[in-house]
Each structure stands twice: as structure tokens, then as C-alpha cells.
Swiss-Prot record:
Residue positions where N6-(pyridoxal phosphate)lysine is found in the record: 360
Family assignment from sequence similarity: Belongs to the group II decarboxylase family. Sphingosine-1-phosphate lyase subfamily.
Coiled coil: none
SUPFAM superfamilies tied to this protein: PLP-dependent transferases
Catalytic activity: sphinganine 1-phosphate = hexadecanal + phosphoethanolamine
An example Gene Ontology CC term for this record: membrane
Protein name according to UniProt: Probable sphingosine-1-phosphate lyase
Keyword ATP-binding: no
Keywords assigned: Lyase, Pyridoxal phosphate
PANTHER family, alphabetized: PTHR42735, SPHINGOSINE-1-PHOSPHATE LYASE 1
Pfam family, one: Pyridoxal_deC
Residues in the signal sequence: none
């Protein structure tokens, strides 16, 4: 990844040569052979499990981590890492500085309350990015055109809906009326009833039974954690010391988070390299007596490809294990399309739970998702502490205690406002746009405009809202970088390299969206093909190019410092990352203690 790799290797090799100079050759050879054997066996289920029971990292990652643990203690290596990471991450600090240019950031809560007008002024920038003025308001018009205050519809999966003004005003009123309510208490029976209604609506959408159970959560990650925690707790109750969560390698990273939080072992199953979906026969070989749950995506975040849910359901029934379908991304899209020929919900025998995000294609406010359990689910996500000295304590769900009833009310209001017919209309328009993009891409490579299907192609056979792009002749990340120069904000993928475009209702309202995207894509690929040999990566391309060979400790440290920069307005522009230090510098102390005017800081961020 970084320019310091060669310096790091030089320092490490020099120290290693000195360390091993008196070691017999046969010991070095045998040690190297052992490492090689272990590295090549990391995909073997039986060997992998022995290591994964002690660490969720793959064998490859464990070798990298071990090498890093040794290397960072060698003379000079720490200084190289510290110096180069500060240099490489300076671009992050610079981006934050530019993003926050002109903002007034306060270090403390104001002594006296501010007026509503002053408070609202702090939101002006982000509100503008969600503001849309439509030129064509006739829903029957074939034309798609709008003016955007904060962009031109070139963001992938960032904004899923544009609420009509009357819905926006309704949500304001609903929030104001319910913000202080709490579904955990029976003081607000209507809020509790609304929550029950929302769960029933969602159960019906996914063809669940009246006896099904469900939770309204804060997002897809929370829904996944709730489901996985329920299954892990059940497994431990059955006497399984090392519960295993078996997922396709394309499953969302939230499953890894769930495994780490619950102390479970995450078992990743390779997917078919041609289709991008997991093969049930292959997954079967990874199921053991320790399996707490198996998982399938409908579809996956990476390439929009859904796993064979029906076949996985049969496998789950045969092996007598729970089966979770992750429909966080596309659940409220596919629920309004005809999937009777290939169901991906509770119609499939063996499916015991589903996660689906309301805040994506359900068009609900951000921070809303559902975790649904079938009538036959062997585990439910509930928590109870009945012998607590503070009284009886029980919550629907393992994570949440008190929550705002406004979340329930706003979901209720949004679903009620749109209605099934509107959701179906939105879903069909997204599929229509995806087909149009694929059609134009096919025409592009068939017309011989200097490009072939080897230069750029859609991976697998995505059927929903995501198109994953790859190239056999170019670095796909370079292509995405060129598209970014043309205003596109796409999601980079890795292992293997690629990028995806996640289509939303917003994109369907842009006249000529597919033509503009294909035009820019063609230009981007041609530009990359004309790159001089040996062109060096930069920015996100450089980061993605190295993360696969980066120790987990270093990955987490970089992420920690990045999040620290985002949440601390002094950390984004001052001082070093402090990766190998534990206390702030005098300069940092001075910045933190400094106050300007009435506790306001006109920062350059």
C-alpha cells in the first residue's frame, strides 16, 4: 500500500538476517515449509476451525499479523510506520478540513439556550444536500428530470428516496409529538400498538405467519447482531462452547462484528467464482455440531447477487440448523416484486429469520430496520433479568433498552403514506433503470468503440438494484477513480477488485441517467487503458490496494484514528496520529484547552 513498504522490508530483512545468522539452515527450511503448509491450508475447514476457535482471523491474516508483531519490534521499524502512516493519512485530515471549511464548531454546550433560528443555521449545509426541486411533477410523464441543490444524482446508494414536501412536514409533526415517548413503558399504548402493527406489516410482506416475532432496530447491523446473538445464546445453552456462524464470504461485515461481540466463531464459505453465489453443497461441508446458524444474502452488498435461498433452506432443514436471510439491502425492494418463482423469504421452508432495512427501499428515516423471526425459529432475540434488585427488567431485543417512540411513529407514518402501490412503482422503476444500464453497456462493448467485455463487465447475474463492475485488463479501482473525477461517488470492492453502483429511487428520476453513466464509464476505462506503465495508485485506490496485506492491528489503528478525526474537530488538523504513543502532546493539550470568544471556535475544518 504505502511507499514505506520497501523501507519496512529492508529494515526487517536486515534485522532478520542478523537474528538468524547462527541458526542452522535445516531449521530455517523446516520453519518456512511449516508456514507455507499452514498458509495453503487456511481454506481447509478442519484446520481453519482449530485456529478460528482462538481468533476469527483467517490463516493468511494470522500469518500477516504474526509477521507484523515481530517486525514492529525490530530496530527502526516503528519509526518508519509512524512517519509513513502520518504522511499517508494526512489526506484524510485535509478532506475533513475542506468539508468543514467555514463551519463554526463549539467546544461546549452554550451557557444560554439558542434561538431556533440560530440552531437551524447549523444544519444548512447538510439540509441543502438533501434538497431537490423537481421540474417534472407529473408522475405519468415519461421524462425524468430534476434540479439538485447538493449534487446531481451521481452518488451510489447514498440517498434512497426523495420525500414529497407534505410527507416531510408530516414527519416533522410526528417527531415533535412522539420524541419523548418510550415504547418500553406502557404509558404510551398507541406507540406500542403502532410498533406491533409495523412488525405485522413486515411479517406479512415477507410471508411470515401470525405467530412470527420481530424487532424494530436502528439499522441493518443491529438487526444482524440481534439475530446472531439469539442463535449464539441458544447454542451455548445447548452446551456448545464454540458456536459457529457460517456465512458466505460475500456476507456483510456486520456478521463479523456480531461474531466478535458474541464471542462466536465466524466461518466463511467460498462462493462460486463465476456466479458470485454460495454453493449449498460447499456450505454443507462447513456445517458441524458447533454450527449455531447458517446465513444467505438476498442480495449481497458487494455485487447484488443473491444466494440460492431455497436450496440453503433445504440444507438447513436437513442439517437441523437455523437459517438467517440477510435482506438488509434489498428486502424492501424484492418484497414488492414478483419473486414467486424464486422466493427469498419465509415462504422457503428452513428460513428462521430475516433482516431487512426500512431506511433503504422502505424510504423510512435513517436508522430503521427490522429483524424478523419465523414461527418455527428456535431462538428469539429477547432479554430478561428477573432477579435484578431494581425490579423486573425485560426488553424486546438483546441490545436496546429505552428508545424513542418517534422512530416507531415515523416508520408507521412513512409506510402508511407510500402504500404498497407506490412501493411497487418505485421497485419496478429501479429494475427498469438497471436493465437500461446493462443494455447500454452491452451495446457499448459490442459496437467496438475501443472497448471489449474484457475491459469492463458486470459480474455475475445481478437481478436487483446493484451492478458490480470488474475488468480483466485494467485496475478496476483506477476506473472508479476516474469516474470520481467525473462526479461519481461509487463503492469500491476488494478481493477481487471492483466497484459497484447501487441504484435508488433518486436515480430513476434523473433524465438520461443510464446514458450519462455509460458515457462516463467508457471515458474512464479508456483513460485507464492509456495510463503509462507503472502508474502509482493514490487516494482510496492506494488504500484498497494495501489493506489485504495489512495487519489487523494496523487496520484497526488507522480506522480508530480516522474516526477520532471525524468526531474530534482538533484531531482532524493537529498533531500526529500517535499510533505508538498513549498521551497527548503539549501542543494538543494547548489546543484542547484553548477557548476563543464565547466558547466558539471558528475552525478551518
Amino acid at each position: 500500500m504505502f511507499g514505506f513498504i520497501s523501507d519496512l522490508l529492508t529494515a526487517a530483512v536486515s534485522s532478520l538476517d542478523e537474528l538468524l545468522q547462527d541458526t542452522p539452515a535445516h531449521q530455517i527450511i523446516l520453519g518456512t515449509a511449516a508456514l507455507y503448509f499452514l498458509y495453503n491450508q487456511y481454506h481447509n475447514p478442519s484446520i481453519s476451525r482449530w485456529y478460528l476457535s482462538r481468533n476469527n482471523a483467517s490463516m493468511k491474516q494470522r500469518i500477516i499479523d504474526s509477521a507484523y508483531a515481530l517486525a514492529k519490534n525490530l530496530p527502526g521499524v516503528n519509526q518508519i510506520i509512524e512517519k509513513e502512516l502520518n504522511k499517508e493519512l494526512s489526506s484524510t485530515r485535509e478532506k475533513l478540513r475542506i468539508q468543514r471549511s467555514g463551519m463554526t464548531l463549539r467546544e461546549e454546550i452554550p451557557e444560554e439556550g439558542l434561538s431556533p433560528q440560530d440552531i437551524l443555521s447549523a444544519f444548512d449545509v447538510d439540509v441543502e444536500k438533501c434538497h431537490f426541486d423537481f421540474l417534472s411533477v407529473n408522475n405519468d410523464s415519461p421524462e425524468r428530470e430534476f434540479l439538485v441543490g447538493g449534487g446531481d444524482g451521481k452518488d451510489s446508494g447514498a440517498l434512497y428516496a426523495i420525500h414529497p414536501k407534505e410527507l416531510t412536514e408530516l414527519l416533522k409533526e410526528v417527531y415533535g409529538a412522539t420524541a419523548l415517548t418510550n415504547p418500553l413503558h406502557d404509558k404510551w399504548p398507541r406507540i406500542n400498538a403502532m410498533q406491533a402493527e409495523v412488525i405485522r406489516w413486515c411479517q406479512n410482506l415477507f410471508h411470515g405467519s401470525k405467530e412470527g416475532y420481530g424487532l424494530l432496530t436502528h439499522g441493518g447491523t443491529t438487526s444482524i447482531i440481534e439475530a446472531m446473538a439469539a442463535y449464539v445464546i441458544r447454542a451455548r445453552a445447548k452446551g456448545i462452547d464454540y458456536p459457529e456462524i457460517v456465512v458466505p464470504e460475500t456476507a456483510h461485515a456486520a456478521f463479523k462484528k456480531a461474531a466478535e461481540l458474541t464471542g462466536a466463531i465466524l466461518i466463511t464459505v467460498p462462493v462460486d467464482k463465476k456466479t458470485g453465489a454460495v454453493n449449498p453443497r460447499v456450505m454443507s461441508s462447513y456445517i458441524t455440531r458447533n454450527t449455531a446458524v447458517i446465513v444467505g444474502s438476498a442480495p449481497s452488498f458487494m455485487n447484488g447477487i443473491h444466494d440460492p435461498v431455497s436450496e440453503l433452506g433445504q440444507l438447513a432443514k436437513k442439517k437441523n440448523v437455523p437459517f438467517h436471510v440477510d435482506a438488509c439491502l434489498g428486502g424492501f425492494l424484492t418484497a414488492f416484486l414478483d419473486t414467486s418463482s424464486e422466493p427469498m423469504d419465509f415462504r422457503v421452508p428452513g428460513v428462521t429469520s430475516i433482516s431487512a432495512d426500512l431506511h433503504k427501499y422502505g424510504c423510512c428515516p435513517k436508522g430503521t430496520s427490522v429483524c424478523l423471526f419465523s414461527e418455527d425459529s428456535p431462538a428469539l432475540s429477547v432479554y430478561a433479568a428477573l432477579n435484578w434488585s431494581g425490579g423486573l427488567y425485560a426488553t424486546p431485543g438483546i441490545l436496546d433498552g429505552s428508545t424513542s417512540g418517534a422512530r416507531v411513529a415515523e416508520v408507521y407514518a412513512t409506510l402508511s403514506y407510500y402504500g404498497k402501490n407506490k412501493y411497487q412503482e418505485i421497485a419496478k422503476s429501479i429494475i427498469k433503470l438497471r436493465n437500461a444500464i446493462q443494455k447500454e453497456l452491452t451495446a457499448l462493448v459490442e459496437e467496438g468503440n475501443g472497448l471489449t467485455s474484457e475491459d469492463i463487465y458486470v459480474y455475475g447475474n445481478p437481478q436487483w438494484s446493484i451492478l458490480g463492475f470488474r475488468s480483466n485488463t485494467c485496475n478496476a479501482h483506477f476506473i472508479a477513480d476516474e469516474l470520481e473525477k467525473r462526479g461519481w461517488k461509487l463503492n469500491l470492492l476488494q478481493n477481487p477488485d471492483g466497484f459497484h453502483l447501487c441504484l435508488t429511487h433518486v436515480h430513476t428520476l434523473v433524465r438520461g441517467f443510464e446514458t450519462q453513466f455509460i458515457k462516463d464509464l467508457r471515458e474512464a476505462v479508456i483513460d485507464v487503458k492509456n495510463y503509462p506503465p507503472g502508474k502509482k495508485a493514490s487516494g482510496n485506490v492506494k488504500v484498497y490496494g494495501a489493506v489485504g496485506m495489512m495487519p489487523i492491528e494496523l487496520q484497526k489503528e488507522i480506522c480508530k484514528q480516522y474516526q477520532k478525526a471525524r468526531l474530534d474537530f482538533t484531531a482532524a488538523s493537529h498533531g500526529s496520529l500517535g499510533i505508538f504513543t498513549t498521551s497527548p502532546t503539549e501542543e494538543d493539550d494547548g489546543l484542547r484547552n484553548r477557548k476563543v470568544g464565547e466558547q466558539k471556535v471558528q475552525t478551518s475544518l
